[in-house]
A protein has these predicted regions:
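Structural signal for hydrophobic packing residues in well-ordered secondary-structure cores
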Residues: 32-39, 80-83, 158, 168-171, ...
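Cofactor-binding active-site loop characterized by glycine-rich and histidine/acidic residues
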Residues: 2-122, 135, 139-143, 156, ...
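Glycine/aspartate-rich loop-and-adjacent alpha/beta segment that forms the canonical ThDP
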Residues: 186-296
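Basic/polar N-terminal segments that are highly enriched at the extreme N-terminus
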Residues: 1-4, 294-296
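Short gly/pro/ser/thr-enriched loop/turn and capping motifs at secondary-structure boundaries
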Residues: 48-50, 127-132, 210-212
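Conserved thiamine diphosphate
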Residues: 3-6, 15, 88-89, 138-192, ...
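Short, conserved beta-strand edge motifs with alternating hydrophobic and charged residues
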Residues: 124, 176-178, 202-206
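Electropositive phosphate-/nucleotide-binding environments in soluble metabolic enzymes
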Residues: 9, 21-25, 69-73, 157, ...
Length: 296
């Protein structure tokens, strides 16, 4: 077995209150390995608002600023301005929000920060629903998902919002997807974002939630890997809003990923076929954008 090239240093304490198999805690661990100790983390209301611990306790070895649900982008912008006034250009400001605080409630503040091209790293750890408050659907929840607000036959009938494309349309220096199942790729992307210094860098991190997805905790990383291998969650980068690079190409059917999760148990073969068509369509668009950027 090949040993992964992952830094040994850790900036998380043992004993946090994340659920067993929580993808969001794995994501934070890898992110801080890349960013280092000169990092301040801005956290709005989300799962990580609880996992971080009540003041003055903390599960992280770096400073944390907790803020309101809708304000991660604005708070990170203000923190960056304060550090600049002090002449501190070395400290990295990282906003760390869930999909609810990014795709929905926080999108206005995020778009404002991005339009100003603030010198921050904004991370969405995406577990595809409002998990902290009881597994309610968000606009990051994929088509076909059963949640507490899309129960029974009322499962979600709309597609997932594409946040990377929305952020890329702002022409920011760097936007990328990452997954807890590919730690080396994820760490390299965070290191790249840290080195860039200047302008907004956005990372969309796929973070499984055993509780909300109705999966065994020990399957958390494997299912995250299946999402990439089936092109349900492709790994790619966008530079300056126009230059696309695909990091990994999937090869498995989407049903391999869907059928192992309780939140999709109600779907029929026809539903799986419909979802496969959606995945193929999105993958085709991504391939086209990548091809065009390579020719230009």
């Amino acid at each position: 077995m090949t040993r992964l090239n992952i830094p040994d240093v850790d900036y998380m304490y043992a004993g946090h209150v994340g659920c067993p198999g929580c993808g969001a805690t794995i994501a934070m661990r890898f992110a801080l390995k890349a960013l280092g100790d000169k990092t301040i983390v801005v956290i709005p209301a989300c799962c990580w608002g609880v996992i971080a611990g009540p003041y003055p306790q903390s599960s992280l070895k770096v400073p944390i600023l907790q803020t309101a649900f809708a304000t991660a982008g604005a708070t990170a912008s203000g923190l960056r301005a304060a550090l600049d006034m002090k002449g501190d250009s070395e400290t990295t400001v990282m906003a760390w929000a869930g999909d609810g605080g990014t795709f929905d409630i926080g999108i206005q503040a995020l778009s404002g920060a991005v339009e100003r091209n603030e010198d921050i790293i904004y991370v969405c750890y995406d577990n595809e629903a409002y998990m902290n408050t009881g597994v309610q659907r968000s606009s990051a929840t994929p088509f076909g998902t059963r949640t507490t607000t899309t129960p029974g036959k009322g499962w979600k009938k709309t597609r997932k919002k594409n946040m990377v494309e929305i952020l890329a349309a702002h022409r920011i220096p760097y936007a990328a997807t990452a997954s807890i199942a590919y730690p080396e790729d994820m760490i390299q992307k965070f290191e790249k974002a840290r080195r860039m210094k200047g302008g907004t860098r956005f990372l969309h991190v796929f973070a499984t939630c055993p509780t909300g997805w109705r999966i065994p905790s020990e399957m958390s990383v494997k299912i995250a890997r299946l999402a990439v291998q089936s092109n349900v969650f492709p790994l790619y980068e966008v530079t300056d809003g126009v230059d696309y690079t695909i990091n990994i190409k999937g090869y498995r059917p989407a049903s391999d990923y869907l059928k192992v999760q309780g939140r999709f148990k109600h779907l029929t073969d026809e539903d799986f076929e419909q979802i496969q068509n959606m995945v193929d369509e999105d993958w085709g668009v991504l391939l086209l954008k990548t091809s065009r950027s390579q020719k230009s």
